A protein has these predicted regions:
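An anion/phosphate-binding loop that grips the pyrophosphate of nucleotide cofactors and donors
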Residues: 42
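Cysteine-nucleophile active-site neighborhood
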Residues: 50-127
Length: 209
């Protein structure tokens, strides 16, 4: 099988090289770019994200990413969000929200609000188990593994049509991963999650056509 061509979206997000290297290690042909044609023609698009929700959205808008993502999804072309790249797929985030305001607007691919974790220690930084649903394509062959998280905010719910993998930190049960046709995302960092993360990326590559 020919190597799958994957674009990791370049919009100023930090530490994207680790995602590029992780994808290359599992056999992908990877390009780091925001070129419209490259994004449209790639077998898969990865949207990484670290830092503040609003800053990630500003970066995405600066390269026209919302339109590029919408076009890919309309054509059934796979997209994978990572960390804040998952959060921005929801309607909005409570991060930096003040009284009387709605918070930062996201891409609204999935309805819902990203909220601060309720836990004795925030951020959630380290390895945690997850609970994938039966039949998950991302977690095929992966059982009882831990994945690496670094975040202070998370989605606590998702629309019924989204297949959700759950995790827990403190008092908060949150969306650790989500699968919805061509659109998938992880709150954890698969590129920093060792063999289990590599297997998940390999599974995602296997869904690309």
């Amino acid at each position: 099988m020919n190597a799958r061509r994957v674009v990791v979206l370049e919009y100023g997000s930090g530490n994207v090289r680790s995602a590029v290297r992780a994808l290359e290690r599992v056999g992908a042909e990877v390009e780091l770019t925001a070129d419209v044609t490259a994004v449209a023609e790639a077998d898969g698009l990865v949207v990484p994200g670290v830092g503040a929700f609003a800053a990630v959205m500003d970066g995405l808008r600066s390269v026209g990413a919302p339109r590029m993502i919408d076009r890919r999804l309309a054509g059934g072309r796979p997209v994978l969000g990572i960390c804040v790249g998952l959060q921005v797929l929801f309607t909005s985030s409570a991060e930096h929200r003040t009284e009387g305001e709605d918070g930062s607007a996201g891409l609204d691919e999935w309805s819902g609000v990203v909220e601060r974790l309720e836990a004795p220690v925030v951020p959630h930084m380290g390895w945690s188990t997850v609970e994938p649903p039966a039949g998950s394509a991302l977690f095929a062959g992966i059982e009882d593994e831990r994945f690496y998280f670094v975040h202070s905010y998370a989605a606590r719910s998702a629309p019924d049509f989204v297949s959700v993998t759950w995790s827990q930190h403190g008092h908060t049960r949150f969306v650790a991963a989500a699968e919805n046709g061509p659109l998938c995302a992880t709150q954890f960092h698969p590129e920093k999650s060792g063999d289990a993360g590599a297997e998940l990326l390999r599974n995602w590559l296997g869904t690309l056509s």
